[in-house]
Amino acid sequence: MDNPGVIAFPPLIWLVNAVISVLVHLLIRLPIMRYGICLACGIVLIVLAPTLALSALRTMKAAGTNVHPSEPALALVRGGPFRFTRNPMYLALCLLQVALGFFLNDSITLLFVVPLAVIFHYGVILREERYLTAKFGEPYLQYKREVRRWI
């Protein structure tokens, strides 16, 4: 099988996490701060997250590799946002969760970024790293040494 074998499609993982966090928000609310400040933070993140994800998507397409983790990696991508983080798309999805917490002015919703990051780490990222190491060898290991996993 020429793919990393991630546990699920990452945007689906984010969606399930976001829905659960909103359901919890409907039961328990723990405000972060004044709503105006939260709204401003949420707006910044809701612009930043898709911008980061789209930049990563364009960079992967330009490199000629597949984007969906169930398909084989065809190239090692080091340009665009991949110069600063090895996982810009997962970082963007985590930022969306934080944005949701700010929009709802809810600490609990915001803190749902923790289980999301843990699921991404163990269910997606570590699997992708093993796969990319096996597929690309030393060039990928060098990239891992030079660029952080998250930020």
Q: For each predicted feature, which ranges?
A:
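Membrane-anchoring alpha-helices and their flanking helix-loop junctions
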Residues: 1-79, 91-151
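Solvent-exposed interhelical
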Residues: 82
